[in-house]
Swiss-Prot record:
It comes from the Eukaryota. This is Transmembrane protein 107. It is a multi-pass membrane protein. Keywords: Cell projection, Cilium biogenesis/degradation, Developmental protein, Disease variant, Glycoprotein, Membrane, Transmembrane, Transmembrane helix. Pfam families: TMEM107. Glycans are attached at residue 79.
């Protein structure tokens, strides 16, 4: 199986950092929603933007579940390619979402961060699940 390198704890920490920022965004999403709206907005417009951002954050949490399941089950824990991809994506997401929260970026920016930093690693994690359980290949 090979020895454990620094990739495993680094991947775990970047996953948790990204998760913490997403949870923080759940708590403080009001300022980001207002940044997405014109200066004068109706309660219906606010509710629509709030629902869209909550849906995006829930999708992100669902993809976290996929990635954490693969990581904690050992399917991708020692796969260095997946670990490097995950570290790069989640570290980038942590930094980008921190700016998203503090600089009050528009809500459409979240979807770009979601695509490259949450969806892409989850898709590759799913491909590893299929390779390991469906095709019976070794995970590393």
């Amino acid at each position: 199986m090979g020895r454990i390198s620094g990739l495993v704890p680094s991947r775990f920490l970047t996953l948790l950092a990204h998760l913490v920022v997403v949870i923080t965004l759940f708590w403080s999403r009001e300022s980001n929603i207002q940044a997405c709206l014109p200066l004068k907005f109706t309660p219906e417009e606010y509710e629509k933007q709030d629902n869209q951002l909550v849906a995006a954050l829930c999708l992100t949490l669902g993809l976290f579940a996929v990635e954490l399941a693969g990581f904690l089950s050992g399917v991708s824990m020692f796969n260095s390619t997946q670990s490097l991809l995950s570290i790069a994506a989640h570290c980038s997401a942590s930094v980008a979402l921190s700016f998203f929260v503090f600089e009050r970026w528009e809500c459409t920016t979240y979807w770009y961060i979601f695509t490259f930093c949450s969806a892409f690693p989850a898709v590759t994690e799913t491909a590893l699940f299929i390779a390991v359980f469906g095709l019976k290949k070794k995970p590393f």
